[in-house]
UniProtKB/Swiss-Prot annotation:
PANTHER family linked: BURP DOMAIN PROTEIN RD22 (PTHR31236:SF2), BURP DOMAIN PROTEIN USPL1-LIKE (PTHR31236)
Native source organism of the sequence: Oryza sativa subsp. japonica (Rice)
Swiss-Prot/TrEMBL keywords: Signal
Classification via Pfam families: BURP
The protein's name: BURP domain-containing protein 3
Region called Disordered, residue ranges: 59-81
Residue stretches making up the BURP domain: 213-428
């Protein structure tokens, strides 16, 4: 009987451990934070069931579900049904392809047998997207793609078989990528929310996050600010903690990491991933506690351990209309977003470009978090999260905030709005 009881206890223990290990990131969140809803900025990064590939850009801007390794059964939706692509199973070439945008905004029909895109033309709405591929170009020479009013512009100079001379712009500078001809290094701007770094000239002129910085004295109803609210990454999915913890994550392992994810060395993506690793390995600023969360579970653990309680709230900026351009917003309401005294402690987690979801999280002291309601000139409503840093003495004197706001470290509180895919954690009570 004793042996039977021991076997039963052992079986139950193994089952319990197995059940714990098999919990999804969402289940872990609900277990650790039963009274805290998960923000949409994080829930959209959770992997979908069924093994199908899913890609999200921005706040649902592009959604791709590929049920098969070949184009049979592929479905692509942009926005709320903005673009629908259905490729009939069994066609190895683009025969039978149909693309519909909005209410017939774009219709593309490629007849079977055309192996090259000679003369192909795609137009969306009133010039929303224009693609013109000149006949005879087997490579991307002469290709031009424009989305919205400059929403995305891609220009590939003729004769470059590789990404030499490629320029990509999203929104009005939402994402800027400049790839120089072969043999030249790829430049990637440093993250503006890592305060040890000095700003580069390129960042000062081209990074839309620069406009997110402002002074606390300007945070009041009636104030007008020119802001472009965007997501800063392509929305890669979270890996479960067990998978993320098994992945190499070090600057010393860059070649192995790139190989594992089939990322070409020397590409923009490779440079961004290497910069993310450097960001994660950089020492904390004075009075800061930092870590990179490579899974949703590790983000929850860092936030709760840093704030010393499981009674926490996670919040992100929510924009009422996707794809809103840079415009003037008027502040309509401001309220404190955290419980506590005059000087709050909070954890901010900033999305970093990587092969899967990675967030640079840091605990900051002498900070205040605000929930800010804003109305855009075009009527777009925004519920923004703003963070104000009362002590900036330990920041790099050439940080982008000081150069844009024309102030010196440690003199006045410096504030910034959060991009849509960043998260702030505060105590809830």
């Amino acid at each position: 009987m004793d042996r039977l009881l021991a076997c039963l206890l052992g079986f139950l223990l193994i089952a319990s451990v197995g059940s714990h290990a098999a919990r999804t990131p969402e289940q872990y969140w609900k277990s650790a934070l039963p009274n805290s809803p998960i923000p949409s900025s994080l829930s959209q990064l959770l992997s979908t069931a069924g093994g199908g590939t899913s890609v999200n850009v921005g706040g649902g801007g592009v959604h791709v579900d590929a049920g098969h390794g070949k184009p049979g059964g592929t479905t692509v939706d942009v926005g709320k049904g903005g673009v629908g692509v259905n490729v009939k199973p069994g066609y190895g070439k683009p025969g039978g392809t149909t693309v519909g945008v909005g209410k017939g905004g774009v219709g593309v029909n490629v007849k079977p047998g055309y192996g090259k895109p000679g003369g192909t033309s795609v137009g969306v709405g009133k010039g929303g997207v224009g693609v013109n591929v000149q006949p005879g170009y087997g490579k991307p020479g002469g290709t031009t793609v424009g989305v919205g009013k400059g929403g995305v512009g891609v220009n590939v100079q003729p004769g470059y078989g590789k990404p030499g001379g490629t320029t990509v712009g999203v929104g009005k500078g939402g994402v800027g990528v400049n790839v120089k001809p072969r043999g030249k290094p790829v430049h990637v701007n440093v993250a503006p929310f890592i305060y040890n770094y000095a700003a580069t000239e390129t960042q000062l002129h081209d990074d839309p996050n620069v406009a997110l910085f402002f002074l606390e004295k300007d945070l009041h109803p009636g104030k007008t600010m020119a802001v472009h609210f965007t997501a800063t990454t392509a929305g890669e999915k979270f890996l479960p903690r067990s998978e993320a913890d098994a992945m190499p994550f070090s600057s010393e392992k860059v070649p192995e990491i790139l190989s594992r994810f089939s990322v070409k060395p020397g590409s923009v993506e490779a440079a961004e991933m290497a910069q993310t690793l450097r960001d994660c390995e950089a020492p904390p600023a004075q009075g800061e506690r930092k870590a990179c969360a490579t899974s949703l579970e590790s983000m929850v653990d860092f936030a709760t351990s840093s704030l010393g309680t499981s009674h926490v709230r996670a919040a992100s900026t929510v924009v009422g209309k996707e794809g809103s351009p840079e415009q003037e917003y008027t502040v309509t309401a401001v309220k404190r977003a955290a419980a506590g005294g005059d000087q709050d402690q909070l954890v901010a987690c900033h999305a970093e470009p990587y092969a899967y979801a990675v967030f640079a999280c840091h605990l900051t002291r002498a900070t205040r978090a605000y929930a800010v309601s804003m109305a855009g000139r075009d009527g777009t409503g925004v519920e923004a999260v703003a963070v104000c840093h009362a002590d900036t003495a330990g920041w790099n004197p050439k940080h982008v905030a000081f150069q844009v706001l024309k102030v010196k470290p440690g003199t006045v509180p410096v504030c910034h709005f959060l991009p849509q895919d960043h998260v702030v954690w505060t105590r809830s009570g």
